[in-house]
Amino acid sequence: MPIVKVRENEPFDVALRRFKRSCEKAGVLSEVRRREFFEKPTWERKRKKAAAKKRHLKKLARENARRVKLY
């Protein structure tokens, strides 16, 4: 859990913004959404495999786009 110490003479809004930013960096909200419901191990493996496949295809598309000559 991210901790933000409020500095002297610091407005509450600024401290809240820093806290939200640190939560976003730490991935707290995405972790909460992921753990909201129980995910069977088979579903988890399936989701991770699909994500890996998507990353791989994206990487291949980037490499192929670099090789295409525009002239």
Swiss-Prot record:
Gene Ontology terms: cellular component: ribonucleoprotein complex; ribosome
Single GO biological process annotation from the record: translation
Keyword Ribosomal protein in record: yes
Keywords, comma-separated and alphabetical: Ribonucleoprotein, Ribosomal protein
Keyword flag Ribonucleoprotein: yes
GO molecular-function term, one example from the UniProt record: structural constituent of ribosome
Family stated for the protein in its record: Belongs to the bacterial ribosomal protein bS21 family.
HAMAP family: Ribosomal_bS21
Protein name: Small ribosomal subunit protein bS21
Organism, scientific name: Alteromonas mediterranea (strain DSM 17117 / CIP 110805 / LMG 28347 / Deep ecotype)
Name of the gene this protein is made from: rpsU
